Amino acid sequence: MHAQDKGGVLPGLSLLLIAVAMVCPSQAAYKLQERYSWNQLDFAFPSARLKEQALASGDYIPTNALPVGVEHFGNRLFVTVPRWRDGIPATLTYINMDHSVTGSPELIPYPDWRANTAGDCSNSITTAYRIKVDECGRLWVLDTGTVGIGNTTTNPCPYAINIFDLTTNTRIRRYELPAADTNPNTFIANIAVDIGKNCDDAFAYFADELGYGLISYSWELNKSWRFSAHSYFFPDPLRGDFNVAGINFQWGEEGIFGMSLTPIRSDGYRTLYFSPLASHRQFAVSTRILRDETRTEDSYHDFVALDERGPNAHTTSRVMSDDGVELFNLIDQNAVGCWHSSMPYSPQFHGIVDRDDVGLVFPADVKIDENKNVWVLSDRMPVFLLSDLDYSDTNFRIYTAPLATLIENTVCDLRNNAYGPPNTVSIPKQAAPGHSAVGPPLYTTTNQYRPVLSQKPQTSWGPSPPSRNYLPALNGNPGIPGSLSKLNNLGAPGQVVSSVSVSTNTVGPSGIEVPKAYVFNQHNGLNYETSGPHLFPTLQPAPSQLGGGLKTYVNARQSGWWHHQQQG
């Protein structure tokens, strides 16, 4: 028996252990799971013949399509494809996740082909970038009305907000931004949606990246206004140099871009966090200000500058969960970062939830859905714009993972660090001199918050393998066969990046310097102070007025538009 162990069983066991050792590190190192991937994008044409005609005419040029935005709702995963180059047949698309659980699915135009006709301003969307689904089952899409990029840009249509009812798949509103809200340099690529006490109490905020402004839109008033007189919207002249995928380039003119909204605070409003693209710093303002049209020229001191994230910390996309965890892309680092908003905004309180020098090259968009699942789209954008993509390789990927899994064992996971549950802080609130109070009754107290923290925790992140091609773990997702939850690790070895170690500061009232934090003061804005984290008590938004919850099924729609084009 012992001889058999040495000659038969043990070698087999050794091979098994080696195989496990090869598989487990990849699974352990990667938290984001690859769901979809493409060498080049494909679209769900009504027929093979129409697809061939589109290819022959140049209406469809597969290598010209780049995905930039992602959003999840029910059984649909929305993907936007801007018309930067010729041959983009649809700009607002989705994947039917019931029909395509993984792989490289065709993109289905939403809500149909006709609604994606370039230049049909009143009836269609010409170019969409980032999009947002709100808790009322509405999809918010800003049509930039542009075709081309940079010096090739033309403007066949004005900027227009399009809102779709996702239960009926119909557009329920279109609002053109007035000339006063834009300027000759305007380029708007990002959106944040703020739902207040009900679905009619809704605002959308738009970041004018190259026109250096912030636009507010009120659903109830069907009106918009622009905040533009603030230097925080401008790029940092010292942060215009970028390095992505071995390409050095300069985006020195890129201003306000990424935005996220906190949960509702005790005063009934949220905080909007934002960053210029050419910057490593985050800024903040209360939506109390943004919702008030009278404050557009009288709000300079209501905007507050936070600390920098650290080196190589450019970001284009950010989102915050309803319990205060902010996720953001780190495009220089091929990574997704995190910050818990109950902690000071300083590098020692920022974590890395995932990094991949192949799969996460330019993680263009980051979203958290209604089930607290995270979705990340990576697209190698600088390579697409400044060099040439290898279309025999996988270029575009969509990843997903539960938020709790991503932040586990990072400084953003307050359940497992030395800080314990955050203490409640209440900040005096009143209207600024000369301005009436807007919104719900104010919450006041004179108690000052002092954090008491124990020994500083140490959080380290190991390096991630350079590629991954396995299926995601899908346990718990409705409508998805359980057999697909097994991982199929096909990753290949490659260069390993250096590990990163981050530790937090020891903070306490015993004479040790406390990290800087930001809290709302009595002047209706934000104040810079050093007494510890800003811990805003949160109230949950009013539940959706829609009966029956979110719709979770949609059929692929074919309007017959392509047949009409062929006949015409």
UniProtKB/Swiss-Prot annotation:
Leader peptide range in chain numbering: 1-28
Tagged with keyword Glycoprotein: yes
Glycosylation sites: N151, N222
Pfam family, one: MRJP
Ranges in a coiled coil: none
GO cellular component, one term: extracellular region
Keywords of the record: Developmental protein, Glycoprotein, Secreted, Signal
Location, primary (coarse class): secreted
InterPro entries per record: 6-blade_b-propeller_TolB-like, Royal_jelly/protein_yellow
Subcellular location: Secreted
Chain's role: Controls the pigmentation pattern of the adult cuticle and larval mouth parts.
PANTHER family in alphabetical order: PROTEIN YELLOW (PTHR10009:SF14), PROTEIN YELLOW-RELATED (PTHR10009)
Family statement drawn from the similarity comment of this UniProt entry: Belongs to the major royal jelly protein family.
Name of the protein in its database record: Protein yellow
Protein encoded by which gene: y
